[in-house]
Amino acid sequence: MRILHTADWHLGKTLEGRSRLSEQADVLDELNTIVKDEQIDAIVMAGDAFDTVNPPALAEQLFYESLSALSDRGKRPIVVIAGNHDNPDRLSAASPLTHENGIHLIGYPTTEPIHIEVPSAGELLAVGALAYPSEARLNEVLSDTFDEKLLRDHYDVKIRQAFEHMTSRFRTDAVKIAASHIYVAGGNQTDSERPIEVGGAYTVAAESLPADAAYVALGHLHRPQTIKRARTLARYSGSPLAYSFSEAGYAKSVTIVDAKPGEEATWQEVLLSSGKPLVKWKAANGLSEVYSWLDEGRDQNAWIDLEIRVADQLSLEEIHRLRKAHPGFIHIRPVFEEQNKDRERIEVKHVSIEDRFKKFYEKQTGGAVPDEEMVKLFLELASGVEEEDAK
């Protein structure tokens, strides 16, 4: 059986007010081409179909039209679970209609697996589909303590038990996979993922992923990656488009899994080419360098984060001229020469870890200042790492 694993479509998401819907339509068309060319038997979409709990109508229309096409009008089974960005009630509202066409929309976490006949493979697919499992969606208070470590431990145990319960009910003659929208400890994050829980309370250990599944399809992290410490093959497929400039330069892909009942699964990554790339320009030589790049036709079909070294503040006229020359400029961020000289004078070893974090945060966010609570949380985490290293 060939299974395509995708996640984190974030339909309706914008980039600083710019619509990405046409790019999202293009990448879903590309997925449809892939499932045909690769003879995919079933699809698992591991959460965050939408970017908000109240997505625009055009995003919902694109979602249902794409599912219809990807399912080949009901011939190819699809399982979609809700992520932390999705409204679980809204996502599953159409289930009575979609279920008849082999499309399973799962809004809330459940401990019962689903078994699906896959006609093209002539095999049975068992899916332990655990939609985003927050306390609210589990309808359960996991702990009455405010101790972060205890909360994390209780949550980890709850997720491990949910997986174990589901996988224990898998039929032995089925291809067995699990799917969830969670943060697994050690995964590489980007700026475009909304934190599942401040402080990391909703973190799952890699070892808590189910060993009895041939494959675990994960959603939430936007960078494709394999979970190394898991007891079975487990991957984040990543998002099909880059949604923040922290993802600039990273390839986007989907994962194809080949599995048979009772055997280990294998996988391959299929790169995606749709959508505009997100790129960073650093113009150390000022406006003249930027216009030189524009004359060369550099990154014509891209969204651009521009950092430009200048002696004085850019005028509104200069900013307008740049945006007219290339409509893809998202950020135009001046860096003043005096600031650069000051930076060169400061040696990192003389800067406190708090100030280094603040400077890093400002750089990553384009000038935003972290609030007191975030700085406090970072210092607590950093202190914990130092204590562990000292042991």
Curated annotation (Swiss-Prot):
This is Nuclease SbcCD subunit D. The keyword Transmembrane helix does not apply. GO terms for biological process: DNA recombination; DNA repair. It comes from Bacillus subtilis (strain 168). SbcCD cleaves DNA hairpin structures. These structures can inhibit DNA replication and are intermediates in certain DNA recombination reactions. The complex acts as a 3'->5' double strand exonuclease that can open hairpins. It also has a 5' single-strand endonuclease activity. GO terms for molecular function: 3'-5' exonuclease activity; DNA binding; DNA exonuclease activity; endonuclease activity. PANTHER family: COMPONENT OF ATP-DEPENDENT DSDNA EXONUCLEASE (PTHR30337), NUCLEASE SBCCD SUBUNIT D (PTHR30337:SF0). Heterodimer of SbcC and SbcD.
